[in-house]
């Protein structure tokens, strides 16, 4: 649900929407927005995080108002990535594609892996998070602290993505991409 004190302007993003004058809330359909709103309405623990007004920054480019969304306190993860992971996993569970006990897999450089691990544990799944060798040990430790098995992959993030996808395919695990 929208904050009654906040007004947003959405520009039609497609030629047909602009031509028809159809109100549009952004990049997604009304059904997609409704689905997301219903998801959050049923989960009070995922309540909206604070919006902080930044008037000095707003004045510089001549904006009326500039608000920053503060996700630093969301489950102690200090990242917004939890919302996307939680929504994606919830949708897969609702569709029957993921069940408690399943193994969820992702490649990450940090926050997405931690969000998948946190959510997997919350819904009774296991998580395997594939990290490139360049990911700092404290990030890997933070992911492991959420209950994930951390798999180090030689090379880059793209190499970790390939290995995660290959192992998920081989073992019948579910990939949660960011």
State each model region's role:
Residues 1-178:
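PLP-dependent amino-acid enzyme catalytic core
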